[in-house]
Amino acid sequence: MNDIPPIIWHMRRHHPKFVSKIELGKGIPSVSYNLRHGGSALIDRKDSKQALAAIGKLGEYIETHQRSAVIFPEGTRSRTGHPKKFQTTGLKVLMKKAPSALLVPISINNSWKMLRYGKFPYGIGSHLIFNVHPPIPNEGDPEALIEQVEALITRDIQVDL
């Protein structure tokens, strides 16, 4: 939730569209509106058929209109700061539907601290740190590319309590 506005700002020239859980489509001023009306894919994580169809449709859209897509393949935010294992199916679908798209890994540090105690107190004194890695062409073995992306992202995650 706290990472979406900075990513939108950083990637504004590339018109980012998000793969986001359906719950974020309501209740967050500006962000929810953008997710619902900006062409993002709102997925029901309990319904894989709906999720994959929405991600596939987004992939076709970004390929046709030369836009960008943002997906968080680790799924749910870690409660400890240690990265979770990537859920690769959604990323594979995007890579298949948008073969000309570049993969731009982004490591986000300290996002788990923002909601460590729930919504109150709200991560006072915590700073989100983004590390945007160089783009990777969507060429070759998808499994190897996903492993490379995961390694880049997890390498730069710093867990300090």
Where in this protein do the model-derived segments appear?
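Catalytic core of membrane glycerolipid acyltransferases/transacylases, capturing the structured
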Residues: 1-47
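A membrane-cytosol interface segment of integral membrane proteins
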Residues: 39-61, 66
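Residue-level signal for alpha-helix termini/capping positions
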Residues: 12, 62-63, 95
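A cross-family acyltransferase "interaction/gating" segment
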Residues: 29-33, 68-70, 76-144
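A cross-taxonomic marker for long C-terminal extensions/tails that follow the last structured domain
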Residues: 138-161
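Short amphipathic alpha-helical segments
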Residues: 6-9, 55, 82-85
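Short amphipathic alpha-helical coupling elements at transmembrane boundaries
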Residues: 7, 33, 53-56, 92
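Soluble extracytoplasmic domains of inner/organellar membrane proteins
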Residues: 19, 51, 57-59, 69, ...
